[in-house]
Amino acid sequence: MANNRYQGTGRRKTSVARVTLVPGSGKFTINKKDISEYFNFDTLRVIAKEALELTNNAESYDVTVNVKGGGYTGQAGAIRHGVARALLEVDPDYRAELKRAGFLTRDPRKKERKKYGLKKARKSPQFSKR
């Protein structure tokens, strides 16, 4: 019996998404909710589905995601990263176009820490000449 489950882990900021692809009709479930119920904004839904759209697999796989940590934008990016990695398990030939689109690269940008003597990470207190 062939294994029809493909898994990938995606990360972005502080979010971690565990993605499972199963051949099906195109259902997209995030934390046991439908994608339209989980993400209120269309832009986030588009980001999450981008890798599937690029490889023309939007209607051929059911996607189940368990995501935690971070905010909605970070979670959408983590889901995209995880879906792209899972698609590589489906067919390694997708690597070139996924890499070109930048979906396989872990986005290293994180929140910069606040430094003492400053208001925020880089914002300094107002300077007074006299």
Swiss-Prot record:
Q: Which organism is it from?
A: Finegoldia magna (strain ATCC 29328 / DSM 20472 / WAL 2508) (Peptostreptococcus magnus)
Q: Which family does it belong to?
A: Belongs to the universal ribosomal protein uS9 family.
Q: Where is the composition biased (Basic residues)?
A: 111-130
Q: Has UniProt tagged this entry with the keyword Ribosomal protein?
A: yes
- In residue numbers, the region (Disordered) covers 102-130
- One BP annotation, GO: translation
Cite the GO molecular-function annotations of the record.
RNA binding; structural constituent of ribosome
NCBIfam families per UniProt: PRK00132.1 (NF001099)
Q: What is this protein called?
A: Small ribosomal subunit protein uS9
The uppermost taxa in this organism's lineage are:
Bacteria, Bacillati, Bacillota, Tissierellia, Tissierellales
Provide this UniProt record's keywords sorted from A to Z.
Ribonucleoprotein, Ribosomal protein
What's any one GO cellular component for it?
cytosolic small ribosomal subunit
